[in-house]
A protein has these predicted regions:
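Acidic/His- and Gly-rich active-site-bordering loop/insert found
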Residues: 3-104, 108-135, 140-143
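Fold-level recognition of mixed alpha/beta catalytic cores in primary-metabolism enzymes, strongest
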Residues: 139-171
Length: 171
């Protein structure tokens, strides 16, 4: 299949998924969670990945999620990442009143873009035209804040690194 036709099919599939994707982004924005505490977010992204037919692995680097799409054993293995955590930003619109967590860095949008890419490739069938494997990674605790929690997890032997991204790669 020609490249332009693949692109057209992917764009069409994403357009058809737009309402669900926008609802996902809005839901995550309204329920921000701090690093290594993204339990609800992790549940939501895993649920969406499963609805697309991805093989999902949970609890990576504590709250991380991986969805895998394999088109063939040959070819590259690439990753698409979307960060799960929020930052502390008291007073921001949709900040959690108890934790002050808010998606001021747009991680809810990153997650949605990750899901849009997956949906576009899967729903269009375009992934069947490609070689290789794609891992869609929901990355925990990317923002380097809330250090007390990270130090505690490290002391408990639950982390090797203070960064969720480094921890996810380590696993």
């Amino acid at each position: 299949m020609e490249r332009e036709e693949l692109k057209r099919r992917i764009e069409e599939a994403i357009d058809q998924e737009a309402e669900a994707l926008m609802a996902y982004a809005d839901d995550i924005r309204k329920h921000p969670e701090l690093g290594f505490e993204e339990y609800r977010t992790s549940d939501k992204i895993a649920e969406y990945m499963k609805s697309l037919g991805l093989s999902v692995t949970r609890n990576l680097a504590i709250t991380g999620v991986k969805g895998e799409l394999v088109s063939s054993d040959k070819g590259p293995h690439i990753a698409v990442m979307g960060e799960l955590d929020a930052i502390i930003c008291n007073g921001a619109p949709y900040a959690d009143p108890q934790t002050g967590a808010a998606h001021q860095c747009g991680h809810n949008v990153q997650q949605t873009v990750l899901l849009a890419i997956a949906a576009g490739l899967i729903r269009s069938g375009a992934y069947k035209e490609l070689d290789g494997r794609i891992s869609f990674l929901g990355v925990p605790a990317e923002e380097y804040c809330y250090l007390e929690k990270r130090l505690q997890l490290k002391e408990e032997g639950k982390l090797h690194f203070m960064s969720g991204k480094a921890e996810l790669i380590h696993e």
